[in-house]
Amino acid sequence: GIIEDLIQFGMEKLVLFGTCGVLDQDIEATSIIIPTSALRDEGTSYHYLPASDEVEVNKGIIPLFQSFLDSHKVSYQKGKVWTTDAPYRETIGKMKRRKESGAICVDMECSAVAALAAFRGFELCHFFYAADHLSEEKWDIRTLSSHSDLDSKDRIADLAIQFALFWEKAD
């Protein structure tokens, strides 16, 4: 709802970042992940786009964002995200299937926001920082819901603001 309101107020570009759970233990906490596509395992995106298994994310913005991160000497990974609105149904079986489909992380809104961006025609730069780790054995909360590694989290928020300013000037 908030993004729809922002569109009505004239928003044309959106930089959105937040946490994600990683499906690969080698992805360190607070690592930046740039989603390239999202597996649609939620309901909202289907109100904006026809049914499909995936939706493209960050259409057209990835090269500019990568260049920005490179110029700031910030490492990142690109990959597919699994979006679900049912976190307590992130079962071992589903997680294995999503990993087999290429997902490296899981979040709760990426596919819905990407569908909204495609439908409403605004530009989107969506990225994550790794928080918890999901595996077949157990859930590792890492830095999710804690005050640990606040300096890295502050740096990521600052990067989002700096990229928004950079992106505005790039046009």
State where each predicted segment sits.
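Metabolite-binding pocket within alpha/beta catalytic cores that recognizes anionic/polar moieties
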Residues: 1-55, 59-63, 119
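Short acidic/polar active-site loop segments enriched in Thr and Asp
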Residues: 12-13, 104, 123
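Active-site rim beta-loop-alpha module in soluble metabolic enzymes
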Residues: 52-100
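Generic structural signal for well-ordered, non-membrane alpha-helical segments
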Residues: 54, 58-62, 91, 106, ...
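Generic non-transmembrane alpha-helical segments
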Residues: 64-72, 116, 159-170
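Zn-dependent metallopeptidase/amidohydrolase metal-coordination segment
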Residues: 111-148
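His/Asp/Glu-rich mid-to-C-terminal helical/loop segments that flank catalytic regions of hydrolases
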Residues: 134-171
